[in-house]
Amino acid sequence: MPIKTQGDLPVKEILERENIFVMDEKRAMHQDIRPIHILILNLMPLKEETELQLLRSLSNTPLQVDVTFMAVESHEAKNTSLSHLNKFYETFTDIKKSKFDGMIITGAPVEQMPFEEVDYWNELTEIMDWTEKHVTSTIFLCWAAQASLYHFYGLEKKPLDKKMFGLFQHRVLNRKIPLVRGFDDVFLAPHSRHTEVPIADIHACKDLTVLAESEEAGLFLAMAEGGRKNLCYGTSGNTTA
């Protein structure tokens, strides 16, 4: 089913060449389908690459998806033009009164910094708190998963002796959870990071349910509040990790 974006979003041409059905707002108005509204907080420096990766993944759903991109206001982007951000991105101020069916918060290349030293940390924590009343289900990817573990549950990340990088074998722990429906019992997924929250700390948190993990790489997927919060620790959505 189609992805709805602004008509002249640059990555639209690439998606169409890949036979992904993308439509603009004008055409969407004539579709007698209630779309699901997804907000994407894009924290990655190369925003257009991340847009493409996430829209490819969202195109696999049978539902019509209405995507809104958001960027933080408290950080000056150096790798994406201001004109692109002004044209295709909303800010928290713009959307804070809205509600969304789902939200994706991407990773960011700041994992070796203390959370409080990230220049947009205060804004991000406000956004994370806002999701609890304005978003039905949120998925936190990579560094954002670490940020959510720290902010909501007080779990600290720890530096690794050497960078974790590569494909690792994982196993599904609870097949009854819809989020892992369609997963193989054992599957490969990539990780690329310098820090981790120990898997034992996550298992020990009564508010979290681990859905998939690796003996070598630790957490891959966890959830809280019956799926209102979902944490994906690998880099399976990225082609440029």
What function would you assign to each model-found segment?
Residues 105-174:
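Cysteine-nucleophile active-site neighborhood
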Residues 80-99:
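Glycine-rich, highly charged phosphate/nucleotide-binding loops
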Residues 1-74, 95, 99, 126, ...:
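Amide-donor transfer/coupling interface in amidating biosynthetic enzymes
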Residues 102:
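Short, Asp-centered acidic motifs that coordinate Mg2+ and/or phosphate
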Residues 68-70, 78-83:
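Active-site donor-binding segments of glycosyltransferases and PAPS-dependent sulfotransferases
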Residues 49, 76-79, 111-114:
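Short active-site-adjacent helix-start/loop capping segments
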